[in-house]
């Protein structure tokens, strides 16, 4: 996973700490996690960051903006008000389901909205 020749097509880092966000933006590759992110960026593969630790500071948002401009998908673990989740498991399933959607992985973790 830490080499472009390994052939990873999609990478998700979730949860992604603010420290990891800053390191990814700065190009650090000093750990396996940072190296996997660096490889995804250099190979122009899909990279999704489930950034946590809100509220976000201006500096955090600038890191997210720059990474987004580089093609990274910023997908914080935030529950949508329309999800109608009534317990913690449903909330978790909604967030995980949204990440799986971004990865192109089918699932049935939450009920999809139906346009009647």
Regions found by a protein language model. Give the residues of each.
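A cross-family phosphate/adenosyl-ligand binding-site feature
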Residues: 1-48, 53-116
């Amino acid at each position: 996973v830490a080499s472009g020749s390994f052939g990873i097509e999609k990478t998700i880092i979730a949860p992604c700490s603010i420290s990891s966000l800053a390191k990814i933006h700065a190009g650090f590759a000093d750990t396996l996690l940072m190296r996997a992110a660096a490889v995804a960026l250099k190979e122009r593969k899909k990279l999704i960051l489930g950034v946590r630790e809100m509220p976000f500071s201006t500096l955090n948002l600038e890191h997210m903006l720059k990474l987004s401009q580089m093609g990274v998908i910023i997908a914080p673990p935030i529950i949508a008000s329309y999800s109608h989740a009534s317990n913690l498991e449903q909330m978790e399933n909604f967030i995980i389901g949204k990440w799986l959607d971004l990865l192109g992985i089918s699932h049935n973790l939450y009920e999809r909205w139906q346009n009647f």
